[in-house]
């Protein structure tokens, strides 16, 4: 996918979880979708927690973790079903968790300036697009799902940077890039951006981000 860009255009890219949205999305999505599509699979939630512990212990990577989570909690589902439940989930998640107001204000500032708005996230595309529509953002770079596996791997860290630069294509030298994220895993893309903004309420993380030359926004509430 190539971004539709004009010469010397500003591109403003936002992470989703804990950047635009206050809380993470994947585990809440698995529970929400299982309740809608396969309620008996809610019995597997303790197993899912065990899988997350295994990931943190270094037994497998995030792509494997998310693939196992989808298969365990949802089984085989058609993409249109996942998109439908993903829309319902996004609506519910925002009603409970909410947007981060300081970041929403940045989005509107970028919009007024005529920037091309993009969400780049490790979240699955089939529900990330539902969040994007709420913000009137039509470009989403996210983790894909084909019903069995994750083509191209998790859109995370260096892979996210690669996909964004691929989308910028030949326009990259003339593009002013702002990237907003809450995660040090996004350092490859934060370091690439002319304007890097880190979202955190942690003083320790704020100091670490500032030491890398990134601006810091501390969400309130």
Regions found by a protein language model. Name each.
Residues 26-27, 66, 161:
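A general structural signal for well-ordered alpha-helical segments in protein cores
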Residues 16, 23, 34, 63, ...:
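Catalytic cores of transferase enzymes with a strong primary signal for eukaryotic protein kinases
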Residues 2-57:
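Active-site neighborhood of HAD-like aspartate-dependent phosphohydrolases
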Residues 52-63, 71:
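A short secondary-structure junction motif
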Residues 3-5, 9, 91-221:
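C-terminal cap/substrate-recognition subdomain and adjoining C-terminal extension
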Residues 65-101:
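Metal-dependent phosphoesterase signature
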Residues 20, 37, 76, 93-97, ...:
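Residues at alpha-helix boundaries and short interhelical turns
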């Amino acid at each position: 996918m190539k971004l539709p860009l004009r010469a010397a255009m500003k591109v403003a890219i936002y992470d989703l979880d804990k950047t635009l949205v206050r809380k993470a999305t994947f585990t809440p999505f698995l529970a929400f979708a299982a309740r809608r599509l396969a309620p008996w699979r809610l019995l597997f939630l303790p197993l899912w927690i065990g899988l997350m512990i295994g990931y943190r212990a270094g037994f497998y990577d995030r792509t494997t973790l998310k693939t196992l989570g989808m298969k365990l909690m949802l089984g085989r589902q058609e993409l249109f079903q996942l998109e439908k439940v993903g829309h319902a989930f996004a609506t519910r998640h925002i009603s409970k968790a909410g947007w981060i107001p300081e970041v929403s204000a940045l989005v509107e500032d970028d919009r007024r300036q005529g920037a091309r708005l993009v969400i780049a996230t490790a979240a699955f595309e089939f529900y990330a697009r539902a969040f994007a529509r709420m913000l009137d953002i039509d470009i989403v770079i996210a983790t894909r799902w084909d019903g069995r596996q994750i083509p191209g791997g998790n859109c995370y860290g260096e892979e996210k940077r690669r996909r964004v630069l691929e989308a910028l294509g030949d326009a990259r030298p003339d593009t002013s890039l702002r990237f907003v994220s809450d995660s040090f895993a996004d350092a490859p893309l934060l370091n690439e951006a002319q304007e890097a903004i880190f979202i955190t309420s942690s003083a320790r993380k704020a100091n670490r981000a500032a030491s890398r030359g990134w601006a810091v926004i501390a969400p309130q509430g």
